[in-house]
Curated annotation (Swiss-Prot):
NCBIfam families: LutB/LldF family L-lactate oxidation iron-sulfur protein. The keyword Magnesium does not apply. HAMAP family: LutB. [4Fe-4S] cluster 2 binds at residues 321, 364, 367. One of its GO terms (biological process) is lactate metabolic process. PROSITE patterns: 4FE4S_FER_1. Is involved in L-lactate degradation and allows cells to grow with lactate as the sole carbon source. Has probably a role as an electron transporter during oxidation of L-lactate. Belongs to the LutB/YkgF family. Keywords: 4Fe-4S, Electron transport, Iron, Iron-sulfur, Metal-binding, Repeat, Transport. It comes from Bacillus mycoides (strain KBAB4). [4Fe-4S] cluster 1 binds at residues 311, 314, 317, 371. Residues 302-332, 351-380 form the 4Fe-4S ferredoxin-type domain. PANTHER family: LACTATE UTILIZATION PROTEIN B. This is Lactate utilization protein B 2.
Length: 473
């Protein structure tokens, strides 16, 4: 899988999402639960806004000094016996991982949940050279078995219910028991445990890399990442270049913010800080590789969208977004959905495929208020729209013509006067009472679901003339 998860056009994807009543119900229920849990966890911590401020300061400081911390990380990982590779593009990253697998003559690879490995199409790259890649995260495993893309950053199978999951297991894996979550989890665990022992390479993502220790931090609730890091003899960790913290002190703050914002917990079940195996340690990989992925991030770092790199992938913005609630994750056409996806995906994937995403927002600002590191998401969405129109010239033709006509009319007193006189008569065939009932052209999408007031028969300038001081009416 790559960052792009659908070849359908944006409107078709949105239409599919709106028509999927189960998905909408599941998303609504999950959003409510996760939102409520996040508020409760934040209240328990106390001084939440101060913690958000601290999180923002840590992320901004790290980005301002990213080159220094990346080199410090590289030096410390190397000192501990690991190998570090800086990948400029997603192709570079995938090629390096292929080369490691070829060198090890690996046939089986097991991996934990990682967005950046999806971004670089790692699974496809390994399958090209004959490797079997097994997802060990339960949600990702369900989707892998069903050949279905993720719909949420932290809950990838959110759009499926347990009956659908049972049917997938029955059809693809021969599962014969009920749709009880415990029974299905036990079945999957047995499947995965057997394959863990045979895997030559384990691949993980990285929630945060600690510069001054050369350590990686992984945050999970299933414990699968610990097995991926400890059983295979070779480990490959893949991280976006921005996922840095200077020291363990900053890690402590950000992990607390991440867990509370993502799932409403003080800590997840497993928070693992590890790296290359040391002489005194009894388990861990014999060989460790860290792949640091740029893939456009350095360009973002030097742009007006820089603050999006503060993201810690908690999905708090997704869990409060009213647009996501109604259309679901697949409508975004990317592994990154919700407000974070609407900002980040066009930066990584370009406007050709994703120019509609910045408009998939009501600009209510709920995402900005929810973000634990205070990314101004709705401002960045507006900035995208400005770039699309003013710099890229990608506004729809109808919109360009409409704005040109408005500009001509608004800048000419004679044209404006004539237009305001003609508007009521021109709109009368589409008017019922004092409302436009049937929109024309661009207005149709609006009037299909909203009321639109009909032009007043009495112009304001006429009303004012009749009611101004000294008037007769």
């Amino acid at each position: 899988m790559s960052m792009k998860i659908s070849e359908k056009k944006f409107n078709d994807r949105v239409g599919d999402g709106i028509q999927d009543s189960f998905m909408r119900g599941a998303v609504s229920s999950a959003q409510t639960r996760l939102y409520t849990n996040r508020l409760k966890a934040a209240d328990e911590l106390g001084n939440w806004e101060e913690w958000r401020e601290l999180g923002e300061q840590i992320r901004q400081h790290t980005l301002e000094n990213l080159d220094y911390y990346l080199m410090q990380l590289s030096e410390n990982v190397s000192k501990r016996g690991g190998h570090v590779y800086f990948a400029k593009t997603k192709e570079d990253a995938a090629k390096y991982i292929q080369d490691v697998a070829k060198k090890k003559q690996a046939k089986k690879v097991v991996k934990s949940k990682s967005m950046v490995t999806e971004e670089i199409s790692m699974n496809h790259a390994l399958e090209e050279i004959g490797c079997e890649v097994l997802e060990s995260d339960l949600g990702e495993y369900i989707l892998q078995v069903d050949n279905d893309p993720p719909s949420h950053i932290i809950a990838p199978a959110l759009h499926k219910n347990r009956t659908q999951i049972r049917d997938v297991f029955k059809e693809k894996l021969g599962y014969e028991n009920s749709d009880d979550p415990y029974e299905m989890t036990k079945f999957v665990r047995k499947q995965l445990r057997e394959k863990f022992m045979d895997a030559e390479i384990g691949v993980t993502g990285c929630n945060f890399a600690v510069a001054n220790t050369g350590s990686l931090c992984l945050v999970t609730n299933e414990g699968n990442a610990d097995l991926v890091m400890s059983i295979p003899k070779t480990q490959i960790a893949v991280m976006g270049m921005e996922r840095m913290v200077p020291t363990m002190e900053e890690l402590d703050v950000l992990v607390g913010l991440l867990c509370r914002s993502a799932v409403g917990q003080k800590l997840t079940s497993y928070v693992t800080v590890a790296g290359p195996i040391q002489e005194e340690e009894v388990d861990g990989p014999e060989e460790f590789h860290l792949v640091v992925v740029d893939n456009g991030r350095s360009q973002i770092l030097g742009s007006e969208f820089r603050s999006i790199l503060q993201c810690i992938r908690c999905a708090a913005c997704v869990n409060v977004c009213p647009v996501y609630r109604h259309v679901g994750g697949h409508s975004y056409g990317s592994i990154y959905s919700g407000p974070i996806g609407a900002v980040l995906t066009p930066l990584l994937g370009g406007y050709d495929d994703y120019k509609e995403l910045p408009y998939a927002s009501s600009l209510c600002g709920a995402c900005t208020e929810a973000c634990p590191v205070k990314i101004p998401l709705h401002d960045l969405l507006l900035k995208h729209r400005q770039v699309i129109v003013e710099q890229e010239g990608r506004a729809p033709l109808a919109e360009k013509l409409a704005m040109k006509m408005f500009s001509m009319g608004a800048s000419s007193a004679a044209l404006y006067k004539m237009g305001s006189k003609m508007a009521p008569a021109a709109m009368s065939p589409f008017t019922s009472g004092n409302r436009v009932s049937k929109g024309v052209g661009p207005l149709k999408n609006w009037t299909d679901i909203r009321e639109f007031p009909a032009p007043s028969k009495e112009r304001f300038r006429d009303w004012y003339k009749n009611h101004k001081k000294g008037g007769d009416k």
